[in-house]
Amino acid sequence: ISKSIELINEMGFEVFTFKKLGLAINSPESSVYRYFENKHTLLIYLTSWYWKWTECRIVFATTNVESAEERLRKSINILTKPVLVDNAISYVNEVLLSEIIFSESLKTYHTKNVDKENKKGCFKAYKSVVQRVSDIILEISPNFELPHMLTSTVIEGAHEQKYFADHLPSLTDVTHGKDAITEFYTELVFNFLKK
């Protein structure tokens, strides 16, 4: 897992192969196929792992916080701020994994098989994060009709803005060293909920 994260981050998902992973871990390519049918299923696994880990971070940050507004702020921070190293999990470099999520995660569900994979539960972890944050939104504004849309827009928009800042800077107003993404999405959400 750790080497696949390193290689996908280094070379990109399109160039990454199980043959290259096998060479990197000094194991036959066929040994990787015992665990994953193809590199797409590996990406789904990594994406699901990331979202379960993110949900744990949200739960930890929001437990015992009475104010729904503060829980929402903390959740938006986790969903939009850069990931820091978590030494509690030695076999996963969360910083590199988050880079993969920003640049490659759309490839997990922008496929022809998305409906079939959804029925198998492949996106359950991501949907759980969206539901958790949507529930907080509904605590603040019980009549708000679009909590899932707002939450998924924050997540995907933040990922796009991070990607644009690194690769297509003329498409964003993000400058390195400033937390514009978190500020933007926090303001967007709370202004939207005031309506």
Residues covered by each model-derived region:
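An amphipathic alpha-helix adjacent to DNA-recognition modules
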Residues: 1-2, 36-59
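Short, amphipathic alpha-helix enriched in basic
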Residues: 1-17
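Helix-turn-helix
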Residues: 14-41
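Amphipathic alpha-helical interaction segments
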Residues: 20, 71-74, 78, 149-156
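Hydrophobic alpha-helical connector segments
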Residues: 45, 61-95
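A short secondary-structure junction motif
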Residues: 53, 57, 86, 104, ...
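Amphipathic alpha-helical packing segments from all-alpha helical-bundle domains
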Residues: 70, 97-139
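C-terminal peripheral helix-coil segments that are non-catalytic and often amphipathic
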Residues: 127, 131-142, 152-195
